[in-house]
From Swiss-Prot:
Amino-acid positions noted as binding Mg(2+) in the UniProt annotation, renumbered to this chain: E219
Pfam families, A to Z: COX2, COX2_TM
Annotated signal sequence range: 1-11
E.C. number(s) listed in UniProt: 7.1.1.9
Lineage, broadest ranks: Eukaryota, Fungi, Dikarya, Ascomycota, Saccharomycotina
Cell compartment(s), UniProt: Mitochondrion inner membrane
Positions contributing to Cu cation A1 binding: H182, C217, C221, M228
Keywords assigned by UniProt, alphabetized: Copper, Electron transport, Magnesium, Membrane, Metal-binding, Mitochondrion, Mitochondrion inner membrane, Respiratory chain, Signal, Translocase, Transmembrane, Transmembrane helix, Transport
Protein name per UniProt: Cytochrome c oxidase subunit 2
Organism of this sequence: Wickerhamomyces canadensis
PANTHER family, per database record: CYTOCHROME C OXIDASE SUBUNIT 2, CYTOCHROME C OXIDASE, SUBUNIT II
Gene3D superfamilies from the UniProt entry: 1.10.287.90, Cupredoxins - blue copper proteins
Task of the protein: Component of the cytochrome c oxidase, the last enzyme in the mitochondrial electron transport chain which drives oxidative phosphorylation. The respiratory chain contains 3 multisubunit complexes succinate dehydrogenase (complex II, CII), ubiquinol-cytochrome c oxidoreductase (cytochrome b-c1 complex, complex III, CIII) and cytochrome c oxidase (complex IV, CIV), that cooperate to transfer electrons derived from NADH and succinate to molecular oxygen, creating an electrochemical gradient over the inner membrane that drives transmembrane transport and the ATP synthase.
Cofactor(s) listed in the protein's UniProt record: Cu cation
PTM info: The signal sequence of COX2 is processed by IMP1.
Length: 247
């Protein structure tokens, strides 16, 4: 029964004392988790090796304080401990650069959503769509005060309006700010990008499963920095078109 529940319930929100990633909903986030796990495996091996070497040196040194008193240099060992770490860094850097390039690449998006950070709320614009009055669809998103939260809503995470996106659709987020530097971050989507005044940054996402994903402004932006949550609702294409018609 527990295995069935674990396969259905996804970890898409921050949890108290959480130390690992939220469940991935995009290929970018899957790549980040895979890269982290692979690198962490080798880092643990290196940590164990270095710890064993230090322990051996301290242990042998306590028995004989001057085991090699006539040894003044060791070119071989110096070459080894210079080249080996450099190779390790190259092995780590190469897949990191590939993933970084793929996360930044935006190719033929099906739709674009603009996110503008302000003190202390977000403004969203669907520039590819217009309403009945001929204007682009845009709205502001504010955090719900704790005294107005309903059952099941999360403090400092739920908002009065949310970004609605269709699943299995290439989406481009264009991020900027109107006052100070903010940061648009949604962990489950593998998105974290600065919102800078006078500058347009972009990032893409391909959401692969329906759900509600939460994020926050991740750049200290003032006294109400913690009151800038981000809520993304991923729905089917049919539900997304229905939502568009209601705007």
């Amino acid at each position: 029964m527990l295995l069935i529940i674990n396969n259905i319930i996804n970890n898409d929100v921050p949890t108290p004392w959480g130390v690992y990633f939220q469940d991935s909903a995009t290929p970018n986030h899957e790549g980040i988790i895979e890269l982290h796990d692979n690198i962490m495996f080798y880092l643990v091996l290196i940590l164990c090796l270095v710890s064993w070497l230090l322990f051996s040196i301290v242990k042998d040194g306590s028995k004989n304080p001057l085991p090699h008193k006539y040894l003044v240099h060791g070119q071989t060992i110096e070459i080894i401990w210079t080249i080996l770490p450099a190779l390790v860094l190259l092995v780590i850097a190469f897949p990191s650069f590939i993933l970084l390039y793929l996360c930044d690449e935006v190719i033929s998006p099906a739709m674009t959503i603009k996110a503008i950070g302000l003190q202390w709320y977000w403004k969203y614009e669907y520039s590819d769509f217009i309403n009945d009055s001929g204007e682009t669809i845009e709205f502001e998103s504010y955090v719900i005060p704790e005294d107005l939260l309903e059952d099941g809503q999360l403090p400092l995470l739920d908002t009065d309006t949310s970004i609605v996106c269709p699943v299995n659709t290439h989406i481009r987020f264009i991020v900027s700010a109107a006052d100070v530097i903010h940061d648009f971050a949604v962990p489950s989507l593998g998105i974290k990008i600065d919102a800078c005044p006078g500058r347009l940054n972009q990032v893409s996402a391909l959401i692969q499963r329906e759900g509600v994903y939460y994020g926050q402004c991740s750049e200290l932006c003032g006294v109400a920095h913690s009151a800038m949550p981000i809520k993304v609702e991923a729905v089917s294409l049919k539900e997304f078109l229905t939502w568009l018609n209601e705007q």
